[in-house]
Every structure is written in structure tokens, then in C-alpha cells.
Amino acid sequence: MPTTSTDPRAAAATLLVPGTTCHGFAVERRETVPELDSDAYVLRHTASGARLLYLACDDENKAFAIGFKTPPADSTGVFHILEHSVLCGSAKFPVKEPFVDLIKSSMQTFLNAMTYPDKTIYPVATTNEQDLYNLMDVYLDAVFNPAIYTKPTIFEQEGWHYELDLPESAEGEGDGSSASLREGTLRYNGVVFNEMKGALSDPMSVLDDAVNAALYPDTAYAHESGGDPRAIPALTYEQFLDTHARHYNPSNSYITLYGDLDVDRALAFLDERYLSQPSATSRRMDAAVAAGEDPSALAPNPLGVQAPVTCEYKRIEMATTPENALVGLGLVLGSALDRKRTIAADILFEALLGSNEAPVKKAILAAGLGGNVVSYTAAECLQPYELIMLQNAQPGVARELRRVFQDACRDLCEHGVPRERLEAIISSNEYDLRQRDYGIADGVAIACDALSTWLYDDDAATLALKIGRASCRER
């Protein structure tokens, strides 16, 4: 039933009562998320299987996102190519570049798409509600009814194709003779192919890929989800279409709505325009493993158990100068669903490595193994990990880096990490949480955060939103 309240939280509370159904969506539960000054509603579309999370709050910068579980089976970059390709026209919007047209004509405050190691997300944000529906319409038609099935050139343009480079003399003649063609050089070209050539020319990206392959053998994380230029040309058009058909369907989707919006209208729009259409309900997957529902596709061992490391030391040669040499040390932190543990580990590593005076970083630099140490926590996967990188590394220091790191950690286990340092880091994180300065539209950042746990457990849609860094004071 329509609501008349101008308070989005009150309107949602009246409309979305757990145990009831609204526009084909079963309302499974309601939770308060005080960290975001919002109420969260978890719903499931009965006919299509689509999951939906609505965060009711008074933010006028409304957001919508649809994501899909997309664990790669190889490094052809098929999901990255799909991310580009579905935004090159659709059944309802048969224009060459609807994405570019939206940037020019919309009141959007965010408009993009992102490929992660195990998911692909299409988020938008705007302060105008009608504009939000326009954006939703374009994005939903793009992901469910893309033009890729009738226009193979989209795959060739965004993925890869052959291109013939002719000598300057032959180009000038332009006669297209067989002699001129024989003098040409055949090469690969394509938007994603070239993008990944650039990305993987960075030694840090190559090192990160190698560490992932070592930490997570026989899983989706062992592959480069963006695509390895050496593997991209192995992808066929037929495989590309089959991958879209198996993964880009409502039963494998995660939809987020956020902000001060008419949720009754939004749910009706989703149900009537897309999720209850025959094409949507008939595409419910029988083989759940195709969308990565089988945990073994993402993690080799039960959650909470570190993945076996089959590659302790690996050397990769690149055409780069010696001063760019890197050594990496990767540490699996557990499960993304153990949110407190992951955040506590992030805070701990900041205390150990976050500055030149941090004890572990100081010990590594004092050992003269390299010029600098950088580290980060990678939380966008089922088993988060910490990657410690030694820059300007001296030859043959991999084993020594591990020894120095372990010795420094043993010393800290015996004597402890200075409490005042941990307090300072937690206080800084608490301030950042209060400020909520994500650098992008809040609703978009929150949709991405939610998927960092929701993707792996339907009951964890709000876990990443409710357990913040501040809760680590309890530990």
C-alpha cells in the first residue's frame, strides 16, 4: 500500500513489516543500524530470487546498486569485459554509449561500475528521485538485456580483437594489396586488453597477483579477475555470452537501495519492470555453483582455517630497473564474516607497520633489506589478507624479510604493543566513522561495504555496516 509519511524511516516501518510481502518481495527482517542512523530491511523477491537491502535514512543523496557474485574460473577477464560491455547498449536503450549519455544528461552524483575479485557492482547515486529511476532503468536493462547477444562487435571492441598494423609506406598507398598485407604486423587490441596491459606493467600489481595465487591456490582468487593480457585472447565470444547468461540473472543478484526515497514505488518499479518479467523468472539458476554458491569455489578450506600456501618463494622477472625490485609477504587473516577479527587485524598492522617508527617496519628498515615498506589489508574477499611489500629490495632477501618480520612479532608478543599507540589508531578510526567521509556518495560506499559480507552469507547483509572499527575497543 502507498505511504504518505515524509519520514523515510517511519514510512518503511509501516510498509515493510517482517513476514509480509510487498510488490513480490518477502520482507525477511528489519534491523537498526545506529552507525548509519538508518534502519535496514532485508528482502527477497519470491519469483526471481533477487536479494534486496534497503537502508532507510534521511540522506537526500539517494543510491541504487546491483551486484552479482562473479568468481572467475581463469584469468581471461571475462567479468571485467562484461562490466564494460553491458554498458554499450541494451534492448530498451539501443544507443552506442548510454553510460556516456547519462553522464552528460543526468543529475547523478555517482555513476560507475566495478569489477572485484569475486563480484561485479553497478552503483548510481543522485539527489533527484525521478533521476534515480531513470538511472535504475538504464542499468537494469543493461545488466539483464544487453546488446551483446546481437552485436558481437561489442565483445571485440571491449574485450579483444586482431588488428593489422601496416608499414607507413603501405598505409600511404592504401591499395590493400596482398603484398602490403604481408608486410603488416598482426597484434591484439581491445579496451580491457589495453587497460590490463597498463595495470600489469606495475610491479606492485604483478606482486599482488602472485601473492593471491600463492595464498589461495585452486580458488577464484588465484586468477586475475581484471584479466591477464596473456590470457584474454583465449576468451571466445560464445564463452563470453554463456558467462553472462549464467551469472547475470536475478537469482544471483544483490540489490541495494539507500536514502530518502519512496520505497513503495522503488519496489514496484523493480518488480514490474524487471524481476517479475518471464525472462527473469525463467532464468533462475538450477546449478548454484555456476554463480559461486559453492564455498569451495572461493576458499580451499573451511572458513577460519588458513589456506595452504603451496608457493613459499617465487621469483618473477619483469623488464624493469633493479631499484624497482619488490618482495612481498602475504598473511591470511581468517574469514570476512569474522568482522571484528578482520578490523582488529587491520588496526594491529597499522600499529606495527603504519609509520617509520612502527616497531615492525622499523625493524625491517634497520635490517637494510630495502628502501621502504608498505602494507595494506585486502578485505574484498572471503578470506582477507595482509600484504607487506618491501620496495627497492636487495637481491635474495625474501627469506630474511620473513625472519625479521617473525622475530619482531615474537618480541611484540612478549613485550606487547604500546597501548597508547593502539588507542590513537582506534580514536582516529572512530573520528573517520563519525565523519563518514567516504570520498564518494555514502549510499554507494555502503552498498559496496555490505557486499563484503553479504556476498558470502545471506544472513550477513548488514554485518559489515554494524560492526565498525570502534567495536574493537571491546578487544
Predicted features and spans:
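Charge-rich, well-structured scaffold segments of protease-associated domains
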Residues: P2-H23, P71, S85-P302, E317-D338, ...
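Short acidic-hydrophobic surface loop/beta-edge motif
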Residues: D39-T46, A307-T320
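Short pre-active-site segment immediately N-terminal to the catalytic Zn-binding motif
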Residues: G67-G77
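N- or domain-start disorder-to-order transition segments that initiate the globular core
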Residues: P2-D59
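Short, conserved catalytic-motif segment at the N-terminal edge
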Residues: E60-F64
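Short, conserved beta-strand segments within well-ordered enzyme catalytic domains
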Residues: L53-L55, A65-G67, P123
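Active-site recognition of the HExxH zinc-binding catalytic motif
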Residues: T76-C88
